[in-house]
């Protein structure tokens, strides 16, 4: 068990947390939620001891081991992948290295023998004999193939490093597991594997995530941060939402009844306070009036941007025809003879672990990259807008947000642009920020603003939910459900994909799988699973 006792954290004059008391117990998974800036990641750092609270303390059951998902992707560059995972249990790793050093000695002494015996006992107690196989199981489950297990971390790309660091956090059955955005940069297959792992994990988990489906799947409780307090709810994310809305509704109804009672008492007092025969009753009602306290109902600190895509023209029946597109980058064949045709009602989600292939295809269709072979043709009634996964190149200038967005605005009017930005949660002086210093979430909101202004009737969106908070994801999700024309997108947010897409495509090493269905139907379809397996086997045979 881990608990926060009267924890207060002040940053300058602001209290990020004020007298927080909460217990996280064994066998439960707690989803830590709150608006951007509420302090979710900071609270995890307080629990792990990285940040010292201004007041109060953190208590952990003696002897329990705490494990944290680390965010530094370069810290273990000089370690092999398998060793990095085993470092999740630092004591076990130290024992393994000390044992190896002793047994490598040429002049093995009696003292060495005694020490080796001690180490072997501790090694066995920590399940050391299963360490490498357990680490390999975690890596394979997350999609890190066996041939990479003995590679050095510096040889891996960013997405692979994220998976290794996650495996490190999960390794060795920790008593308390702290996970900050564990689904970031994971493909949907890896997320599904992590969901099953956490569902079957018997110890304490505290997780921060913007993935609503993930929180619904794994959480037994929700800890909601708002106004420097943390309120604990039993149940998953959807249950929290319904419970919190019901609580507010009940408080409003109770306040309404109290206000009616106050009005009734005030009218009686005003009418009869000067009446000698009624003075006792008036005095009694004054006392009753003084006892009535209205519940304080604070509006949630959560804010939702206004996202609404409106095409400027209707789209015809001919939308997009792709014929035999192939692309190899750095010696890796990402696209192999890909062909498909889009209709005017298609909302296509590209799924599967081959995210680089999807990015390459989107760049080709957006005109930013040439295919090695094949061709594509957009319909004459289509207008396209593109959301790249990496938007760095869009934000290198010294322009303010207002000036940056003005380039894409149909109305060259500062008041119009500021109003538009206000709906996207850039208020007051936010519009004067230089775009080259914006956070990831701010950049995404700028890109979405640009796309809304385009009035396009066809959208390409490569991971638009990355860097967004839950409120912004919800707003984008609802907008794309309503979006009346063609959409090609990819996202690692299960609920986002399930509620938006009506057609699923998967770019496998052996070719394209294409199915007109929802994402859940695709996952449950045995025929699609067999087809995926056959295509992967054919690709391996060709290699």
Task: Walk through the language-model features, giving the residues of each.
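A structural signal for long alpha-helical coiled-coils and helix-turn connectors
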Residues: 103, 241, 270-273, 277, ...
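ABC ATP-binding cassette signature C-motif
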Residues: 1-255, 309-543
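ABC ATPase nucleotide-binding domains
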Residues: 251-265, 271, 278-287, 303, ...
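Short, flexible cytosolic linker that couples an ABC transmembrane/permease module to its adjacent nucleotide-binding
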Residues: 298-314
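Extended non-transmembrane interhelical loops and adjacent amphipathic helices
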Residues: 113-116, 186-187, 283-294
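Short amphipathic coiled-coil heptad-repeat segments
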Residues: 136-142, 267-271, 287-292
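Proline-centered turn/helix-capping motifs that create local helix->coil transitions or kinks
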Residues: 130, 277-281, 291-301, 377
């Amino acid at each position: 068990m881990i608990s926060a006792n009267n924890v207060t954290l002040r940053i300058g004059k602001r209290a990020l947390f004020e007298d927080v008391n909460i217990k996280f117990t064994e066998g439960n998974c707690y989803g830590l939620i709150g608006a951007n800036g509420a302090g979710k990641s900071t609270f995890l750092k307080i629990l792990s001891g990285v940040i010292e609270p201004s007041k109060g303390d953190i208590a952990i059951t003696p002897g329990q081991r705490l494990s944290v998902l680390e965010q530094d992707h370069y810290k273990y560059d000089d370690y092999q992948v398998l060793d990095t995972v085993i470092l999740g249990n630092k004591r076990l790793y130290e024992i393994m290295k000390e044992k190896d050093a002793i047994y490598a000695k040429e002049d093995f002494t009696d003292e060495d023998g005694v020490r080796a015996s001690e180490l072997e006992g501790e090694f066995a107690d920590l399940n050391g004999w299963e360490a490498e196989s357990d680490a390999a199981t975690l890596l394979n489950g997350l999609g890190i193939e066996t041939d990479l297990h003995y590679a050095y971390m510096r040889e891996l790309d960013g997405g692979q490093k994220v998976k290794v660091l996650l495996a490190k956090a999960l390794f060795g059955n920790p008593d308390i597991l702290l996970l900050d955005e564990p689904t970031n940069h994971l493909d949907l297959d890896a997320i599904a594997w992590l969901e099953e792992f956490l569902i079957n994990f018997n110890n304490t988990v505290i997780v921060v995530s913007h993935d609503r489906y993930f929180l619904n799947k794994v959480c037994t409780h929700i800890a909601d941060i708002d106004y420097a307090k943390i309120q604990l709810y039993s149940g998953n994310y959807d249950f929290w939402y319904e419970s919190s809305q019901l609580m507010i509704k009940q408080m409003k109804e109770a306040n309404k009844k109290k206000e009616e009672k106050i009005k009734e008492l005030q009218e009686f007092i005003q009418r009869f306070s000067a009446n000698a025969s009624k003075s006792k009753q008036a005095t009694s009602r004054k006392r009753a009036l003084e006892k009535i306290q209205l519940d304080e109902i604070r509006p949630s600190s959560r804010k939702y941007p206004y996202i609404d895509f409106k095409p400027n023209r209707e789209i015809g029946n001919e939308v997009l025809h792709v014929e035999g597109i192939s692309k190899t980058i750095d010696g890796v064949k990402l696209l192999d003879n890909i062909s498909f045709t889009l209709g005017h009602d298609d909302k296509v989600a590209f799924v599967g672990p081959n995210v680089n292939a999807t990015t390459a295809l989107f760049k080709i269709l957006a005109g930013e990259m040439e295919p090695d072979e094949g061709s594509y043709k957009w319909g004459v009634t289509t207008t396209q807008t593109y959301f790249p996964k990496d938007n760095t190149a869009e934000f290198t200038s010294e322009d303010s947000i207002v000036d940056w967005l003005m380039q894409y605005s149909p109305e060259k009017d500062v008041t119009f642009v500021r109003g538009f930005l206000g709906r996207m949660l850039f208020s007051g002086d936010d519009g004067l920020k230089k775009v080259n210093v914006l956070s990831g979430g701010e950049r995404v909101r700028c890109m979405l603003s640009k796309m809304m202004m385009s009035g396009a009737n066809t959208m390409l969106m490569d991971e638009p939910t990355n860097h967004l908070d839950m409120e912004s994801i919800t707003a984008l999700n609802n907008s794309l459900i309503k979006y009346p024309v063609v959409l090609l997108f990819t996202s690692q947010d299960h609920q986002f994909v399930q509620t938006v897409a009506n057609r699923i495509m998967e770019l496998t090493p052996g070719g394209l799988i294409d199915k007109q269905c929802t994402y859940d139907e695709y996952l449950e379809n045995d025929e699609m699973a067999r087809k995926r397996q056959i295509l992967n086997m054919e690709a391996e045979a060709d290699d």
